[in-house]
């Protein structure tokens, strides 16, 4: 058997990782400024993470959600306190797509309606409802096509109001910051309008914080910069620092009943141990403040570079839009400086999503490399 060839791969084989660094099978060291799509939130092989997952594995790694798993309650309590959503409930699952599937489903159960508003450049996952809410026709199979998902131009209040006027809306799903779309930040007034329209029309406000959450922007959730509250919040990626885990934060107005949602692996002991390690480290190392401070530092160092058209960022979530395609720069950062970065659906946008505990010295290595390549005209 061979692997199903769906991933374009760099010719790299990493065998060790620590903090913001990776080593390949030739013992060459790489600086990781992408974290596998914002997954590595507290750094590779963080001691607290390794210890908690190892200790848990030595006791019990898995049983299904047919028995009490008290460590799930510990995750919910810690997450509620650090996020400011203490009165919400947590449903644990395995990935971002699964979190969004359950969010859209739960919203429809609650609202008793079918139509969902989503936005241009959105990415919510590759499974049934999640991919139907994603603005990329190339990954939507015929069986996933649905007229229950209405695409509205991002940050366009007039179009949003029209969609509510013309349809019975079950939910609005929006990313706290669009990641794949190129780090597009929703305007405060736009999020406020979503909140007010959802209240007026008894629709559910779903905020997808899978990439933008868990302290990446300097707030625990990106939408908290706008001081609005979502009814449902979806999480994954940085939640487990590499261990597959996702979750749905659910407002008190939603009524739970047995069988309404379900998962085999979600909330297993190891996933919970990983999640607790991340939350404890974010709090202990004050990583929200580090994300704010170093994000501002990176912006100040790069904002006047002549190669750059625009920098869109909050905290350590960066979309650096160049005046040309970012592919040559990204390739040379990797081949000449051993620095891993990301791209986006817009070909000119370089994405930077480092661990939240990255240091100024580590960022300086990227800044120096960027400026050298910028001056060289690539």
Language model region names:
Residues 1-378:
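Conserved N-terminal phosphate-binding loop of PLP-dependent enzymes in the Aspartate aminotransferase
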């Amino acid at each position: 058997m061979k692997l199903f060839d769906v991933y374009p791969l760099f010719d790299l084989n990493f065998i060790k990782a620590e903090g913001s660094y990776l080593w390949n099978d030739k013992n060459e060291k790489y600086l990781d400024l992408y974290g596998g799509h914002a997954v590595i939130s507290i750094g590779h092989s963080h001691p607290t993470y390794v210890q908690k997952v190892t200790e848990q594995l030595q006791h019990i790694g898995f049983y299904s959600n047919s028995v009490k798993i008290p460590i799930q309650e510990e995750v919910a309590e810690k997450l509620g306190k650090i996020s400011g959503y203490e009165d919400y409930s947590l449903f644990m699952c395995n990935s971002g797509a699964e979190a969004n599937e359950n969010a859209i489903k739960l919203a429809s159960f609650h609202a008793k309606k079918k139509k969902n508003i989503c936005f241009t450049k959105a990415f919510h996952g590759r499974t049934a409802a999640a991919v139907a809410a994603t603005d990329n026709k190339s990954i939507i199979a015929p069986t996933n096509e649905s007229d229950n998902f209405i695409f509205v131009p991002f940050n366009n209040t007039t179009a949003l109001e029209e969609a509510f006027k013309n349809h019975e809306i079950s939910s609005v799903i929006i990313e706290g910051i669009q990641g794949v779309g190129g780090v597009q930040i929703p305007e405060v007034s736009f999020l406020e309008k979503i909140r007010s329209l959802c209240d007026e029309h008894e629709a559910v406000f779903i905020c997808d914080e899978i990439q933008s959450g868990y302290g990446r922007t300097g707030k625990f959730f990106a939408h908290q910069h706008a001081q609005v509250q979502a009814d449902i919040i979806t999480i994954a990626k940085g939640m487990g620092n590499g261990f597959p885990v996702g979750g749905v934060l659910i407002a008190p107005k939603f009524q739970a009943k047995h069988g309404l949602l379900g998962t085999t692996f979600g909330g297993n002991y190891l996933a919970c141990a990983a999640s607790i390690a991340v939350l404890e480290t974010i709090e202990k190392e004050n990583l929200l403040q580090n994300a704010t401070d170093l994000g501002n530092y990176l912006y100040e160092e790069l904002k006047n570079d002549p190669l750059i058209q625009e920098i869109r960022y909050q905290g350590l979530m960066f979309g650096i839009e160049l005046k040309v395609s970012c592919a040559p720069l990204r390739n040379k950062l990797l081949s000449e400086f051993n620095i891993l970065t990301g791209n986006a659906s817009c070909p000119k946008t370089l994405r930077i999503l480092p661990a939240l505990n990255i240091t100024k010295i580590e960022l300086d290595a990227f800044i120096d490399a960027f400026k050298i390549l910028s001056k060289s005209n690539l």
